[in-house]
Amino acid sequence: TRYHCVTGVQTCALPIYEIMGGKADPIQISAFLTAMTMKGETIEEITACANGMRKHGIHMEHDKDVLEIVGTGGDKSNSFNISTTASLVISAGGVAVAKHGNRAASSKSGAADCLEALGVKIDLEPEKNKEVLEKLGICFLFAQKYHMSMKYVAPVRKMLGIRTIFNILGPLTNPAAATMQVMGVYEEALVRPMAEVLSNLGVKRGMVVYGQDCLDEISLSAPTSVCEIKDGTFEEYVITPEEFGMTRCTKEELVGGTPQENAEITKEILAGKKGPARDAVVLNAAAALHVAKEIPMQDAVKLAEELIDSGKAQKKLEEFVSLTNKLAEEE
């Protein structure tokens, strides 16, 4: 296995195939990931790598138009699990959510860690997840279950502790092939390119967002750069918390901790606790509701607030925990 030149679509896709096929050793994987991070990835390279990773993964068959909301990670903010919490609000609004995630790579608590701490059974078989999606309009697709080849990469990512192309690839390889997506990225230079990659991969409507205070979500402490995808067209703009009646906070007010601590933050938000954490969830859930329902962002913010205040989002979590545990016992 030789990675003599990390440029060009073919040279980039080949290592991904070899890594996913278990043919590369940890030193080679580390060298490839570090070099790609230093070079910066092109739209074509990322698309090729995402397609390569999808081909090595397990697909979940379903007949719903599903949405994914996810951040790349790698922003070093250590915020609580905003998009994971938002996914429960979005689903409560009648939008089918296939949340694809993993355990923490470059933070303390990944989506899988947080949901597990909330009581959700995260490692159901695809057929059981299909049932959960059909009954509840939400499911969690544990990356390790669907992208088993990631076992070759996970230890190296953990050891490196830096953002790599896999921070980007994870959100691009949803096993349910989501056609709607809100994706947060860790640097502004990725906003438009990632929108183009998502469109290349079949996303019809979506938003790629970057909080200008280095947050891979819509920020409550700074303006957010957005590139919106509408059937192959792209619109770039900037939004601020004030536009939606939100008060800015500091990044520190959104810092999370262990999976248990982040799960507690999620529970408090869904129980109606007001404050910056709730507002961050509302804004990010609203982006997804705007994308899925094609309603103005202001209306989507009001809807997200209503879904929390009515208890519908909290009920969605309770149903999610109950059904996944029931199905896990049957396996």
Q: Model-flagged regions — what are they?
A:
Residues 1-12:
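Single conserved hydrophobic/aromatic residue that forms the stacking wall/gate
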Residues 10, 25-26, 42, 83, ...:
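Helix N-cap / loop-to-helix initiation motif
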Residues 13-54, 327-330:
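N-terminal Rossmann-like NAD(P)+-binding subdomain of aldehyde/semialdehyde dehydrogenases
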Residues 19, 33-37, 68-73, 288:
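Short glycine-rich or small-residue beta-strand-to-loop segments that form or flank ligand, phosphate
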Residues 55-58, 79, 94, 116-123, ...:
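Glycine-rich anion-binding loops and their surrounding alpha/beta cores
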